[in-house]
Amino acid sequence: MSWEPDTLTKYCRPEMFEELAAARPKLKICLAHFGWPWCRETAMLMLKYTNVYTDTGALYFDNAKEFYTQMLTRDVPMTWIDRSLRHQVMFGSNNPRFEQIRMAHAIKELGFRESTLDLICGENAIEFLGGIPNRKA
């Protein structure tokens, strides 16, 4: 979702990127902010297209842990990320708008497996940017 005043929200829906993801399977696409508030739509696209990624730099209101608990355990069940989407989620903080340290601590406190945290907190970004591929089982 864009906070730009002249940007229509209808063009921010993750589903608007499906044709591109399907037509260009080698093009890596990052749907920013987990597609908030359409997080499940983002997850659906990530399940369907391995070239679709997202980041955790979503808007939160005062408390990063409470927001991530809602977004990454209820809106999108944590098991979906831990089991199926772990190679497509990258840490993001929207710095300087929000404090990345608080956001990183909140992500780490949710209860993801250590290997999933390693992917989210760095390895996936390296792979996304053309570094060493990490598509492990």
Over which residues does each language-model region extend?
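Conserved, mostly hydrophobic/aromatic
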Residues: H33, T54, N94, L117, ...
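Detector for Asparagine
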Residues: N51, N63, N94-N95, N124, ...
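Mid-to-C-terminal alpha-helical segments outside catalytic/metal-binding sites
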Residues: L85-Q88, F98-A137
